[in-house]
Amino acid sequence: MTVSELNEQAKALLETHFSFVEVTGEISRLIRHSSGHWYFSLKDEKSVISSAMYKFSNQQVKFEVKDGMQVTIYGKLTIYPPSGSYQLLANKMLPVGIGELELAFNQLKSKLENEGLFDIKFKKPLPKFPKKIAIVTSLTSAAYQDMLKVINSRYKLCEFIAFNTLVQGEMAAANIIQMLQKADKMGFDAIVLARGGGSKEDLWCFNDENLARVIFTLKTPIVSAVGHEIDYCISDFVSDHRSLTPTAAMVDLLPDANTILQSLDIAFDKFESFIDGKFQNSFNILNLINQSLKNQAISQKIEKANLTLENKKANLENLITSKINNLAHKIKEFELVFDRQEQFFKATKNMVQIEKNGKIMPLHELQIGDEISIYSQITKKNAIIKS
């Protein structure tokens, strides 16, 4: 028997009897090879074992592995025939004492925070009266429908464009990045990144490091509205504003039309009171001057003062008239814009968009048997062309 044959037989025997092992220990001498494989030692107080984790396995590890970290490894024992060395081949690795996702979240949060990506000095203010907003979310989600309800009931002077994206799974982060970068180039006043509630695993794509760095570079103010109030994602910290829910994002961004009209009424009343006060103050001053000049019998000064007062009164009346006319004109413009938006919403209420395999299709290009999706402003239906 040759040495090679002996090593191969020993390898087969070892892998047969130890095809699955669960071992807990401390990582030491970790080497990340250029091939993508990891080589390290796993040790406790008394012993150490050489270990390896190939690229296709370590790519599934979500947290950052470091020397000194306590981990549990799932794998098998084997022998590396060229050297005859006995080693542990890891298929899966989990941290000890804390969940894998929680550790990965805390590590990334600390890393980005130390780099300054969460610093308040980089936060862009949200527009007070937005005219054009992008919504990046799944168009089939309940969260999107809830947002539309708030839009239709609260403020109709703003244009909304939705960017359909995955919001869950391995491909979601890359898809979201693509949609955010596309929206950022289109001159929106704000972007809303939204998703409804879900488990930590469901929301994990919003903890992607590449996504966080892209959000930080966006020129457009962005609102992160992911999950429920208790759910925190990395996107919440790096965005310009965090809303508790997708519905809350619409409330945070959109002013209430009724509140705007009430504010205009209040402003007009305050302005009117201010002008009345100015008039009264001027008349009081005039009376004091007249009283003072009576004893001096200099009617010429009184006439001059009266003339000055009349001029000031005329100027003030012209100013008041101008201000009131400007305010009335602005209110009229506001009402006209509001009416046009209302008519637009009514006119397009029953318009639909046809998609086949995610692509917008004209009606004349559809064939019998095609499976299509029909979208309106408030719903979606699936159908099959029969004739």
From Swiss-Prot:
EC number: 3.1.11.6
Top-tier EC class: hydrolase
Compartmental location: Cytoplasm
Keywords, in A-Z order: Cytoplasm, Exonuclease, Hydrolase, Nuclease
Gene Ontology biological-process entries: DNA catabolic process
Alphabetical list of CDD domains matching this protein: ExoVII_LU_OBF
Pfam families assigned: Exonuc_VII_L, tRNA_anti_2
Main location, first listed in the record: cytoplasm
Keyword Cytoplasm: yes
This protein's record includes keyword Amino-acid biosynthesis: no
Family indicated by similarity: Belongs to the XseA family.
Full protein name: Exodeoxyribonuclease 7 large subunit
Annotated organism of origin: Campylobacter fetus subsp. fetus (strain 82-40)
